[in-house]
């Protein structure tokens, strides 16, 4: 609102695309529209842009109204190489395997994309390759996912850089799996291996960033920039119809009233279910009259960085299943 950039890109985990967050997503679009931006959400698969990793991300692109009409999401560029193909040259250079036959056997075993590189943070997670299910996937590819090996140290079974599960990866290898290479994309990561791993795992894959960046660049530099768009045409993403009815009304409404006002066909049971979902991100005010409960949409109370938010407790209870 203060800086008024011409374009904005935000990315989050795939979970934000679930129906449970429809009201949350629309609230974000509504606020951006108030500030003069058209916006759209879309799920992007990193492996469709050359990143050898299962890394679905939910991306928001917002642009000032006059530019957004020229924006087109980038088209997938084909499937990425496998983990084995991606890391073959580094494994050979570091002499991880005794000979080429052993290396080739490992490349054949690691014949799929990597699980999501999660990186961790000071509060959540350390220098390993993710939760339990990710470690099992690494095990199936002949990689020990229970830690990392230092870039500047040789491999040896004596220091457990190679175990019965296979070799541990180095930050350089993880960076390659995240999309950095020695040609088009390169970066010097600072700190020790855990710090490097966090920088790598929490970054947006460079090939995906490039594809989205070029799409934004092309829209901003379109030869014939369109005139300002009407405000109501700025929002293209699907919304929760119950959220929309409550938002537009601003008044108390019964479940039957909400169902009747909704453009999409929803029965009263579905209305009640969606109100329950909305209550996780918004204050839903209730009022009883003549034996009927009426509802009104209140303030937004979803996570916006609060240290005391309930999401932290939920994260701790479920961290082994989060990637």
What feature does the model see in each segment?
Residues 1-140:
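Class I S-adenosyl-L-methionine
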Residues 98-323:
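C-terminal target-recognition/interaction regions appended to catalytic cores
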């Amino acid at each position: 609102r203060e800086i008024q950039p011409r374009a904005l890109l935000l990315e989050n985990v795939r979970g934000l695309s679930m129906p449970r967050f429809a009201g949350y997503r629309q609230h974000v679009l509504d606020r951006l529209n108030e500030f003069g931006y058209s916006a759209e959400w879309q799920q992007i698969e990193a492996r469709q842009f050359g990143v050898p990793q299962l890394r679905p991300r939910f991306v928001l692109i917002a642009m000032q109204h006059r530019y957004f009409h020229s924006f087109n999401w980038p088209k997938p560029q084909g499937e990425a190489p496998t983990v084995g193909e991606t890391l073959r040259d580094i494994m050979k250079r570091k002499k991880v395997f005794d000979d080429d036959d052993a290396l080739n056997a490992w490349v054949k075993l690691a014949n799929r994309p990597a699980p999501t590189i999660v990186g961790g943070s000071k509060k959540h997670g350390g220098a390993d390759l993710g939760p339990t299910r990710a470690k099992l996937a690494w095990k199936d590819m002949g990689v020990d996912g229970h830690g990392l090996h230092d870039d500047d140290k040789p491999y040896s079974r004596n220091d457990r850089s190679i175990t019965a599960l296979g070799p541990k990866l180095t930050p350089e290898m993880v960076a390659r799996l995240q999309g950095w290479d020695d040609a088009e994309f390169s970066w010097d990561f600072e700190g020790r291996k855990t710090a490097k791993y966090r920088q790598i795992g929490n970054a947006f894959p460079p090939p995906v960033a490039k594809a989205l960046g070029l799409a934004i660049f092309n829209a901003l530099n379109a030869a014939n920039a369109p005139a300002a768009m009407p405000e109501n045409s700025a929002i293209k993403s699907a919304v929760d119809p119950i959220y929309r009815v409550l938002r537009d009304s601003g008044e108390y409404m019964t479940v039957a009233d909400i169902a009747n006002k909704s453009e999409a066909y929803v029965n009263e049971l579905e209305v009640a279910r969606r109100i329950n979902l909305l209550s996780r991100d918004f204050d839903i005010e209730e009022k009883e009259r003549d034996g009927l409960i009426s509802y009104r949409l209140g303030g937004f109370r979803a996570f916006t960085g609060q240290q005391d938010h309930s999401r932290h407790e939920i994260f701790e209870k479920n961290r082994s299943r989060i990637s």
